[in-house]
UniProtKB/Swiss-Prot annotation:
Binds 1 pyridoxal phosphate per subunit. The modification N6-(pyridoxal phosphate)lysine is found at residue 256. The gene is argD. GO terms for biological process: L-arginine biosynthetic process. Its EC number is 2.6.1.11. It comes from Xylella fastidiosa (strain Temecula1 / ATCC 700964). The lineage of its organism: Bacteria, Pseudomonadati, Pseudomonadota, Gammaproteobacteria, Lysobacterales. Pyridoxal 5'-phosphate binds at residues 107-108, 141, 227-230, 285. It catalyses: N(2)-acetyl-L-ornithine + 2-oxoglutarate = N-acetyl-L-glutamate 5-semialdehyde + L-glutamate. PROSITE patterns: AA_TRANSFER_CLASS_3. This is Acetylornithine aminotransferase.
Length: 411
């Protein structure tokens, strides 16, 4: 490690230690490559946790940001600004269901807004507080704020934050009988789920399950809330993951890829709930600021293109095939590769169970950046415009990294 790296990393003692970053100081990015301060390049198959959907420093996004930065940075929502209004209209138009949009700055804020909207809607229906329950699924991840982390049905994210807010109920993912049992009492106001669970191990929804959930929501008078913060904006091969199921939701939340790397979140509200929240019912200081909205408008246009959809589908096949070939080359490192589009998870074989974090470190040593989704799953969420050459290079580096790791394990 260079003296510069050591000097910069020494500053980490001033940062609340809630992260455990790879010991690399990144200083520049272009496309699906990033560089550290020593000039070493890395193939980025993590994309800032599925955020940099158009790669690093996409020229069109940079141009939009620079242009808006020279005009107007921030107004708050006390005043109108054109970029946020235009973005809201474009999200409504492209969503195929929404009537109104709430803009914020992150995914957890979008989910908090959705939770509050569900509760407001239930109250407007005359439902008592005990009849405003929200059902979520084990393995889910909806954010870190107190409401969102309570919706997140994973105890490891909740421990130590008790007492948690009430009014949530958890069921097993992809089990329709369990869901109906949780709803039959008539106290459920909404069902909230990710079409693909990201932090929960890259677990895709079972074919036909979302339609069954929609039917139960209709039967028991509940809203359907879809968290597409990670799986939306083209990542699964269609702009919205729910399009593949031909289901109409009531609320959809977005963030991550929507800004292409610039912080933004959005909650899309359908006709049942679009008019429920009126003046003063909710708000944000930074949400929908002109710079974020200007960048997101360009990102949305590009992510909705047929070119991006085609590339996601093609590279998904290549990435899946590459991972399966690498696994076979080393005696079955992975038991399966699951997911959709460019949101794939490689499940570690029992011999390597619990070692995802260690593998990530070795991968970085070999110049490829990955994520994990729990201790047993390597997560791959590259830029949606990743090129053939970039992906091939990433797979070469990953093969070398896994070969190195397997050799170390075998002594």
């Amino acid at each position: 490690m260079s003296a510069v790296s050591e000097s910069v990393l020494s500053l980490s003692r001033y940062y609340l230690p809630v992260y455990r970053p790879c010991q690399v100081v990144l200083v520049r990015g272009q496309g699906s490559r990033v560089w550290d301060e020593q000039g070493r390049d890395y193939l980025d198959l993590a994309a800032g946790i599925a955020v940099c959907c158009l790669g690093h420093c996409d020229p069109d996004l940079v141009a939009a940001l620079v242009e808006q930065a020279g005009r107007l940075w921030h107004t708050s929502n006390v005043f109108y600004s054109e970029p946020s209004l235009r973005l809201a209209q474009e999200l409504v138009d492209v969503s195929r269901f929404a009537e109104r949009v709430f803009l914020c700055s992150s995914g957890t804020e979008a989910n908090e807004a959705a939770i509050k909207l569900v509760r407001k809607w239930a109250a407007a229906q005359g439902r008592l507080p005990e009849h405003r329950t929200i059902v979520t699924f084990r393995g889910s991840f909806h954010g870190r704020t107190l409401g969102a982390v309570t919706a997140t049905a994973q105890p490891k994210y909740q421990e130590g934050y008790e007492p948690l807010p009430g009014g949530f109920r958890y069921v097993d993912f992809n089990h329709i009988e369990a869901l109906e049992a949780a709803m039959v009492g008539g106290d459920v106001a909404a069902v909230m789920l990710e079409p693909i669970q990201g932090e929960g191990g890259v677990m895709p929804i079972a074919p036909g399950y979302l339609a069954q959930v929609r039917a139960l929501c209709d039967r028991y008078g509940a809203l359907l809330v879809l968290d597409e913060i990670q799986c939306g904006m083209g990542r699964t091969g269609t702009l919205f993951a729910y399009w593949q199921e031909e289901v109409v939701p009531d609320i959809v939340t977005l963030a991550k890829g929507l800004g292409g790397g610039f912080p933004i979140g959005a909650m899309l509200a359908g006709p049942k709930v679009a008019e429920v929240m009126q003046f003063g019912a909710h708000g944000t200081t930074f949400g929908g600021n002109p710079m974020a909205a200007a960048v997101a408008r360009v990102a949305l246009r590009k992510l909705a293109s047929v070119e991006i959809a085609a590339n996601v589908q093609r590279q998904s096949v290549a990435l899946r095939a590459g991972l399966e070939e690498i696994s076979e080359a080393f005696g079955g490192v992975f038991t399966q590769v699951r997911g959709r589009g460019l949101m794939l998870g490689a499940v570690l074989a029992p011999l390597y169970a619990g070692q995802a974090s260690a593998i990530l470190e070795v991968a970085a040593e070999h110049g490829v950046l990955l994520l994990q989704a729990g201790p047993d799953v390597l997560r791959f969420v590259p830029a949606l415009n990743v090129s053939d050459e970039e992906l091939a290079d990433g797979l070469v580096r990953l093969r070398a990294a896994l070969g190195d790791y397997v050799s170390r394990c075998r002594g």
